[in-house]
Regions:
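Non-globular targeting/processing and membrane-anchoring segments
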Residues: 1-49, 70-79, 85, 92-103, ...
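Short glycine-rich or small-residue beta-strand-to-loop segments that form or flank ligand, phosphate
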Residues: 49-55
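Short, solvent-exposed coil/turn elements at secondary-structure transition points
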Residues: 56, 86-88
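Conserved redox-active cysteine motifs that mediate thiol-disulfide chemistry
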Residues: 56-63
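Short acidic/glycine-rich loop or secondary-structure boundary segments that cap or lie
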Residues: 60, 90-91
């Protein structure tokens, strides 16, 4: 993932604006996410870039994505970009489950230099 391609992703606000499925559920879960002051301080102490690959119809994305989006809201040094799986095969194909499956959601965490530091790909059977 290059910095230039990462920058082409949607912000969470832009993602929410284009949602046709599950928008209300996403917003409810985001609002219901409870964060402690320790949670907020931990994320503010980091300089991260977070890549999310999803689709609005994906129920599995409703499990972790709203909470993560809420967590980074108040973190000025954390940048999250969202890519729709079906519209961005070049991005999706870099993060295939077991090198074969276009499983979503995908969350990839980078440091400020775009070095990958962590990755989560949905674990349900493909």
């Amino acid at each position: 993932m290059t910095p230039e391609r990462f920058a082409q992703g949607m912000t969470v606000a832009a993602y929410l604006a284009q949602m046709r499925s599950n928008k209300e559920r996403f917003e409810q879960r985001m609002a219901a996410t409870e964060l402690t002051s320790a949670d907020r301080e931990a994320i503010r102490a980091r300089k991260l870039k977070i890549l999310v690959i999803t689709e609005d119809w994906c129920g599995d994305a409703l499990v972790g994505f709203p909470g993560l989006a809420r967590l980074v809201e108040g973190a000025p040094d954390v940048e999250m970009r969202v890519f729709l799986r079906d519209a961005n095969p070049d991005v999706m194909d870099q993060y295939l489950k077991r090198g074969l499956y276009r499983t979503i959601p995908v969350f990839v965490f980078f440091d400020e230099h775009m070095n990958e530091v962590a990755r989560f790909i949905e674990s349900r059977p493909a």
